[in-house]
């Protein structure tokens, strides 16, 4: 066991995490040269394109060190984005060490810091590495200073490397072996294995990626999940050297996979503990929690007959993404669809993109909303994740909205504009620190404000230099109201929005004005109204198109013309009673694009 090292790599998007992983795999001979491709561990196309890692992957590598011994290195690749922070904490708790990769030309960024703190809290040894030192813009001294300043770990002897050219990668491995402690654990104790990740394979069912903490696991053993109590017979165990390789047993300290013929991904929850059914461990490993969705949106097929196809696609996606939740929903305006829950905005975008890409779906997405806690006047509390389910204003005692703590990092030139943005978003400043040229701002902002367009606006006010991460803090009482949109007196449920009272009139007016531009003119007048309860706050009219019925009258008597105009008026009136207004897809997106003033 002294020759095992379990480690993961922490880095901000585009600081070269996946490239470094590729180089390490190459140096250790995990894949033949012809199988080497860029970003080996990012298996989804969308992961490669966006340059992000979504699912955790592992590689068990053997490396002959300079002291002549052969070490088994288990690389656990972690997602770097804040939406997947729970997956990150599970991957990190399976390691004893983490390589902190910092781009020598850019310095420390927000998500690196968030994940690095997670690592330090879990007691993981952090080994700093400066990447991209082959760039002319690289400034290693500055980067070292930032690491010590912002994260507070000693980085004077940080290893320097360039993952692109392969320079210094062996030094990284050497310092890893020297600094990271070997795993502790007893192969003879009752089995405890932490599920780092799980995914669905069409041939063998669910594959669980585990770190064995104590005990030994062999095929044909009966295992039990400690969160659910379900039992399964083990079919195969083994390791990935990115390619899977079956072994006779996995014992304490190793990272590998278990295949046990599990059909449902929900049975193998990330962070759960696996133990033997017969000789069970006394207690599960700490840190398991159910992941709760933070952001909700309605997904509807553009063609009504695609509903079943959408359901199947969501079922298939759920096989590989246990944190995705969905339930059927009916909207008067959009027909049948699903209310889906996501971990955050990036997660939502990825799910939509995968549905459109891998399953060829055409989707309409409603505005994303967050979950409100509503205390009704009879004292009961309900959770509302859909504006349509918000009770009438008279039945509400108070509404609490989720507040998140946001950490922002940016160069000091942009502090002013970022603070202005946070104030607009009803944020309250908690802290502000200077680290050299970088500034760290901490704000508490309502989640609803972040969901809308906070990230995009943050990037635009800071010219792309600011980075952020957020975590849920608490529910707090707030004066929020539901704004309904009425078209010719009929409520359109999919256009309802929940906003703070201070912005409700403004948002109502804006949405009404947007709708007026988007809805095509009809044969009769269309009234668009925004209402809070029974109180109308805004109205826009779309004038009717009319045919010139007098074109055929030359001269003649006025009564003749009057008769024709009256007849036209009657017709329009009748039309208005039976007609329904088609609402184009853009109208639903219009809500998203309303800027806060």
UniProtKB/Swiss-Prot annotation:
GO terms for biological process: positive regulation of translation. Pfam families: EFG_C, GTP_EFTU, GTP_EFTU_D2, LepA_C. Keywords: Cell inner membrane, Cell membrane, GTP-binding, Hydrolase, Membrane, Nucleotide-binding, Protein biosynthesis. It is found in: Cell inner membrane. Its EC number is 3.6.5.n1. It comes from the Bacteria. InterPro entries: EF-4, EFG_III/V, EFG_V-like, EFTu-like_2, G_TR_CS, LepA_C_sf, LepA_CTD, LepA_IV. GO terms for cellular component: plasma membrane. The keyword Protein biosynthesis applies. Residues 2-184 form the tr-type G domain. HAMAP family: LepA. This is Elongation factor 4. It comes from Burkholderia cenocepacia (strain HI2424).
């Amino acid at each position: 066991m002294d020759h095992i090292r379990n480690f993961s790599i922490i880095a901000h998007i585009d600081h070269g995490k996946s490239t470094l992983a590729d180089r390490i795999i190459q140096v250790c001979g995990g894949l033949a040269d012809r199988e080497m491709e860029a970003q080996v561990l990012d298996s989804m196309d969308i992961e490669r394109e966006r340059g992000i890692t979504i699912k955790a992957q592992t590689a068990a590598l053997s490396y002959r060190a300079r002291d002549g011994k052969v070490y088994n290195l288990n690389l656990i690749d972690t997602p770097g984005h804040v939406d997947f922070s729970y997956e990150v904490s599970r991957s990190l708790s399976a390691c004893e060490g983490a390589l902190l990769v910092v781009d020598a030309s850019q310095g420390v960024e927000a998500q690196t810091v968030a994940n690095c703190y997670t690592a330090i809290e879990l007691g993981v040894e952090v080994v700093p590495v400066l990447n991209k030192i082959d760039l002319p813009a690289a400034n290693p001294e500055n980067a070292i200073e930032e690491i010590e300043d912002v994260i507070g770990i000693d980085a004077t002897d940080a290893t320097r490397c360039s993952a692109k050219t392969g320079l210094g990668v062996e030094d990284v491995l050497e310092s890893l072996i020297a600094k990271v402690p070997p795993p502790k654990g007893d192969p003879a104790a009752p089995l405890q294995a932490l599920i780092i990740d799980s995914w669905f394979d069409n041939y063998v069912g669910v594959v669980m990626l585990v770190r064995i903490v104590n005990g030994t696991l062999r095929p044909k053993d009966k295992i039990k999940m400690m969160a659910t109590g379900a039992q399964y017979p083990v079919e195969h165990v083994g390791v990935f050297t990115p390619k899977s390789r079956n072994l006779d047993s996995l014992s304490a300290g190793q990272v590998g996979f278990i295949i046990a013929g599990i059909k449902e991904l929900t049975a193998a929850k990330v962070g759960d503990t696996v133990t033997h059914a017969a000789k069970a461990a006394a207690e599960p490993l700490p840190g398991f929690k159910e992941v709760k969705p933070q952001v909700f949106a309605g997904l509807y097929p553009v063609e009504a007959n695609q509903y079943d196809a959408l359901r199947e696609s969501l079922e298939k996606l759920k096989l590989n993404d246990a944190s995705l939740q969905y339930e059927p929903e009916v909207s008067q305006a959009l027909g049948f669809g699903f209310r889906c829950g996501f971990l955050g905005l990036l997660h939502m975008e990825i799910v939509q993109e995968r549905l459109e890409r891998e399953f060829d779906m055409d989707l309409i997405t409603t505005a994303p909303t967050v979950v409100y806690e509503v205390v009704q006047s009879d004292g009961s509390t309900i959770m509302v994740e859909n504006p349509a389910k918000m009770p009438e204003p008279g039945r509400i005692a108070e509404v609490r909205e989720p507040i998140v703590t946001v950490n922002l990092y940016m160069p000091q030139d942009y502090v002013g504009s970022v603070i202005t943005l946070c104030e607009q978003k009803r944020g309250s400043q908690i802290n502000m620190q200077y680290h050299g040229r970088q500034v760290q701002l901490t704000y508490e902002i309502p989640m609803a404000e972040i969901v809308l367009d906070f990230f995009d606006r943050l990037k635009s006010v800071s010219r792309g230099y600011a980075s952020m991460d957020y975590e849920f803090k608490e529910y707090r009482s707030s004066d929020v109201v539901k704004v309904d949109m009425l078209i010719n007196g009929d409520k359109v449920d999919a256009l309802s929005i929940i906003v703070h009272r201070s912005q409700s009139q403004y948002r109502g007016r804006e949405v009404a004005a947007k709708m007026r531009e988007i809805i095509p003119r009809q044969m009769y007048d269309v009234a668009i109204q925004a209402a809070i309860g029974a109180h109308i706050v805004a109205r826009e009219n779309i004038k009717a198109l009319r045919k010139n019925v007098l074109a055929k009258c030359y001269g003649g008597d006025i009564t003749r013309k009057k008769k024709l105009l009256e007849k036209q008026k009657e017709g329009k009136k009748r039309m208005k009673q039976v007609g329904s207004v088609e609402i184009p897809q853009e109208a639903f997106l219009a809500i998203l694009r309303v800027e806060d003033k």
